[in-house]
């Protein structure tokens, strides 16, 4: 009797230790955090995730919205095997599924942006047994025109530098071509001058020979 009790105690203690050492199952969410888009355009709210468990039919994705000026949280989109769009509210007929669970992508597409779409969008992914984890957030700003960011300035600088290099290369190539053409023209003129000089000398020689013969 005592032997069975001690064995159970050891197994229970071992189970507790293994549970403590086993990593907590949690879904990691990755978003752009901040997104700026022009009024009237469409925007892709990108949300990707990682999970210890393989992706299966139990996967669920929930998108919600918190208005910038406050107010209750609003339903945006739900995915479980199939996408479920909202039947009413501000996002009715304005949101579609743009993700791929096999590629760990839970993104959605929001159409015809309006200024009252400003706010925070949350992306929650559950992939049992991975059901815990931080909810991803995207702060959307709908503007009249997109402002230049550091990336835009960097792209503009790189593009300008590339254009300048191309112009320099073209100028160098044209200059080399012009020099070769000038050298060819000069060489041709030299050959013509030499030919004319030789012809003149030959004529003079013929005249002098003729005069000698007449004498």
From Swiss-Prot:
Domain of life: Eukaryota
Signal peptide annotation: 1-26
Gene3D superfamilies: Immunoglobulins
Alphabetical UniProt keywords: Cell adhesion, Deafness, Disease variant, Disulfide bond, Glycoprotein, Immunoglobulin domain, Membrane, Non-syndromic deafness, Signal, Transmembrane, Transmembrane helix
Glycosylation sites: 39, 118
Domain Ig-like V-type: 27-141
Family: Belongs to the myelin P0 protein family.
Name this polypeptide is given: Myelin protein zero-like protein 2
GN (gene name): MPZL2
């Amino acid at each position: 009797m005592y032997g069975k009790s001690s064995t159970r105690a050891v197994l229970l203690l071992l189970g507790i230790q293994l549970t403590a050492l086993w990593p907590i199952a949690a879904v990691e969410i990755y978003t752009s955090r901040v997104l700026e888009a022009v009024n009237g355009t469409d925007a892709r709210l990108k949300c990707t995730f990682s999970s210890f468990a393989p992706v299966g039919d139990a996967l669920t994705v929930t998108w919600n919205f918190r208005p910038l000026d406050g107010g209750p949280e609003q339903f945006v989109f739900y995915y479980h095997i199939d996408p479920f769009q909202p039947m009413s509210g501000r996002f009715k007929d304005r949101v579609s599924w743009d993700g791929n669970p096999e590629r760990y992508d839970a993104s959605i597409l929001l159409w015809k942006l309006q200024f009252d779409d400003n706010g925070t969008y949350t992306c929650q992914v559950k992939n049992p047994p991975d059901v815990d984890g931080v909810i991803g957030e995207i702060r959307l700003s709908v503007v009249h025109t997109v402002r230049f960011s550091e990336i835009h300035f960097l792209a503009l600088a790189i593009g300008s530098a590339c254009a300048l290099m191309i112009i320099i290369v073209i100028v160098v190539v044209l200059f080399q071509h012009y020099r070769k053409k000038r050298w060819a023209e000069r060489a041709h003129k030299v050959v013509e001058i030499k030919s004319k000089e030789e012809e003149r000398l030959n004529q003079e020689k013929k005249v002098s020979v003729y005069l000698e013969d007449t004498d």
